[in-house]
């Protein structure tokens, strides 16, 4: 077990480094201030991503908005694992557990689907197919019982660019507590999941 600071960034960075000759262009973006609104020029609400892609694709005579619409994004962020000490806060059949692989979340947010991205069934199927073909163990989970707390991710901001986005991350025991616990196996499998996504020959339809 290990503590979780920057686990998602580590897994994504390691996968980007190991993605040799992918069929499609891969981009890994690191942002901060996620816990305080994702504001500022280094938060996900900045124009950096769109401006970067616009500059990048214009050299090929392409439109940034068309490239974004044809892309798929994994928003790497942790998810709350079922805590046996606070079982009433979780819907056990819809939440994640340690040592079962990364969590793929159709939606996060609080109060049901408030302040969230809601991935389409087609996008969920696209990611599921990639992970299953790569034989990467994974699980589906939500951030606690509906209408009982919860939290959002930057997927809500990414998806405003008409970019299909899905949350994925390791489950965390006691998220936001002074001591958080994750599984090294889940961290490794998150790396494998992101690498499989980067290296997949599948194109979005």
Please annotate each region the language model reported.
Residues 1-3, 34-39, 112:
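A short glycine/serine-rich beta->alpha loop
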Residues 79-86, 90-179:
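Active-site-adjacent substrate-binding region
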Residues 7-15, 126, 189-192:
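Short amphipathic alpha-helical face segments that pack within enzyme cores
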Residues 10-103, 150, 202-205:
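Acidic/histidine-rich catalytic neighborhood of metal-dependent amide-processing enzymes
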Residues 4-9, 49, 119, 190:
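Phosphate/oxyanion-binding active-site loops and adjacent basic polyanion-contact surfaces
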């Amino acid at each position: 077990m290990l503590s979780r600071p920057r686990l998602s960034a580590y897994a994504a960075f390691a996968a980007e480094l190991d993605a040799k000759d992918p069929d499609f262009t891969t981009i890994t973006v690191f942002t901060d201030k996620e816990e305080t609104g994702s504001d500022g020029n280094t938060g996900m609400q900045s124009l950096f991503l769109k401006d970067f892609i616009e500059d990048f694709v214009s050299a090929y005579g392409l439109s940034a908005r068309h490239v974004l619409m044809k892309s798929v994004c994994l928003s790497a962020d942790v998810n709350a694992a079922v805590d046996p000490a606070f079982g009433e806060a979780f819907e056990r059949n819809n939440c994640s557990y340690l040592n079962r692989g990364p969590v793929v979340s159709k939606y996060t947010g609080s109060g049901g689907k408030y302040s969230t991205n809601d991935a389409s069934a087609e996008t969920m199927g696209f990611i599921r197919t990639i992970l299953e073909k790569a034989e990467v163990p994974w699980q589906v989970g939500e951030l606690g019982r509906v209408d009982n707390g919860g939290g959002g991710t930057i997927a809500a901001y990414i998806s405003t660019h008409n970019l299909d986005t899905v949350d994925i991350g390791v489950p965390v025991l006691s998220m936001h507590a002074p001591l958080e616990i994750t599984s090294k196996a889940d961290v490794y499998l998150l790396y494998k999941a992101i690498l499989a996504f980067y290296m997949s020959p599948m194109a979005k339809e």
